[in-house]
Regions:
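Conserved small/polar residues in nucleotide/adenosyl-binding loops
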Residues: 6-14, 366-373
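Short glycine-rich or small-residue beta-strand-to-loop segments that form or flank ligand, phosphate
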Residues: 58-70, 95-102, 283-285
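Histidine-anchored nucleotide/phosphate-binding helix
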Residues: 70-89, 301-308
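Short internal beta-strands
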Residues: 93-101, 316-319, 369
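An acidic, phosphate/nucleotide-engaging active-site surface
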Residues: 105-175
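Conserved phosphate- and dinucleotide-binding cores of soluble alpha/beta proteins
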Residues: 150-155, 160-238, 243
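Membrane-embedded hairpin module used as a gating/binding unit in multi-pass transport
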Residues: 206-289
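C-terminal catalytic subdomain
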Residues: 292-365
Length: 378
């Protein structure tokens, strides 16, 4: 199983006690440079990138941060920059804005890990701080009432390109696409109000059932994000898709919505796995670095594991969690004794780390209620 930057072992005593080993469908790795150029020159729902930008444009590449390096953006951002150069956009007219959402600032070494050494040495790099109001511009409100505050580097650019990878997401259905704008380069108020839609409309209803992994239709979190992204009007998208071995197997590019949506369909086909039966015990792998960089990031693996384990069963998560800079809102949220107490506090002051903890708490309570004798073990 993947743990940190390597592999960890789980020892099994008797084969007949193993119900199933669930892995993504085998998909060969691709030639990243070739696939990136192909998706920019023969895009989905869009003209080629070179025909969209023009000499004199100031281009902002909004790029996912260090917590998303599983997307291997360091392997393909260079090809985007060079393609812009071929369209007569010099390095001096290009900047990269890291879509950090509410995450911490990156170190210079982490910047290099995200975009590669050459890009980091050639292109202006900006860190997004969701709480720095001097860096934010109000561009409107969504139909759900979310005030949309966006980083000025994205707002002031002539062209915005969104760069990430696509995988499933805990409550937005899928990551990537519109998430590069909200929450990626949005203000803290915008992010928290948007993410509140992950809860049901009334106290006691818990998590909104429409805001689950792989769900996009009528998902209020995703729809709200898309509306906010449309206010910025990114001109192009370049996203990677990785296989079960963590290698890039596809690149999608083109219209920021249509190309992303096509990418989500590819992800579903690659990651969907058949399951013989629900298990009594499930070992859940967080996916290795950077997905297991912290308890906060790694605990998201409980959600898919919950589907594979019987109510009252046991989920054992395997992760390294080497980054001790856990969000305080995540660690402090486990002080509540009941799910109701936790939900009440979350509705009063919603934060993303708090929600992730609440989701974990809800999963745990589902199993503990069904089999209370597991309490001491858990």
């Amino acid at each position: 199983l993947r743990m940190s930057r390597g592999l960890g072992d789980v020892y099994k005593r008797q084969e007949e006690h193993i119900s199933d080993v669930l892995e993504g469908n085998p998909t060969p790795a691709c030639d990243v440079e070739e696939a990136t150029l192909e998706c920019m020159r023969h895009p989905i729902g869009s003209r080629p990138l070179q025909e969209i930008v023009r000499k004199g444009d100031k281009v902002c590449i909004v790029c996912a941060d260090i917590t998303r390096t599983w997307n291997h953006s360091d392997q393909f951002v260079i090809h985007i920059v060079n393609e812009l150069n071929r369209a007569e956009i010099p390095d001096s007219d290009i900047c990269i804005l890291f879509a950090q959402g509410t995450h911490r600032a990156q170190t210079p070494e982490e910047d290099i890990r995200v975009v590669g050494k050459e890009v980091a040495s050639r292109i202006k790099l900006y860190q997004h701080d969701c709480k720095n109001k001097d860096e934010l511009v109000h561009v409107g409100d969504t139909k759900l009432g979310t005030p949309v505050w966006i980083n000025k580097h994205a707002v002031d650019a002539d062209k915005v390109i969104v760069v990430d990878g696509i995988t499933t997401h805990l409550f937005a259905g899928y990551g990537g696409g519109r998430k590069l704008i909200l929450p990626g380069v949005a203000g803290d108020e915008s992010i928290q109000i948007n993410h509140c839609n992950a809860l049901g409309t009334e106290f006691g209803s818990g998590i909104n059932p429409a805001t689950r992994s792989t769900l996009l239709d009528h998902n209020p979190v995703s729809d709200d994000m898309q509306e906010a992204s449309d206010m910025i009007k990114p001109c192009f998208l370049v996203h990677s898709i990785v296989n079960a071995d963590g290698q890039i197997c596809r690149m999608v590019g083109g219209d920021p919505y249509e190309a992303w949506l096509e990418g989500t369909k590819l992800v579903y086909r690659i990651q969907k796995v058949p399951m013989k039966q629900e298990a009594d015990v499930g070992f859940a792998c967080a996916g290795g670095y950077p997905k297991d960089v912290s308890l906060y990031q790694g605990s998201k693996c409980y959600d898919p594991a919950d589907v594979a384990v019987k109510d009252g069963g046991i989920i054992i998560a395997i992760m390294e969690a080497s980054d001790i800079q856990e969000p305080p809102a995540y660690l402090n949220s486990f002080q509540y004794e009941t799910e109701a107490d936790m939900e009440r506090a979350l509705r009063h002051h919603f934060t993303i780390p708090f929600f992730v903890a609440f989701n974990l708490f809800s999963v745990s309570y589902t199993h503990l209620r069904a089999h209370e004798t597991c309490a001491d073990l858990v």
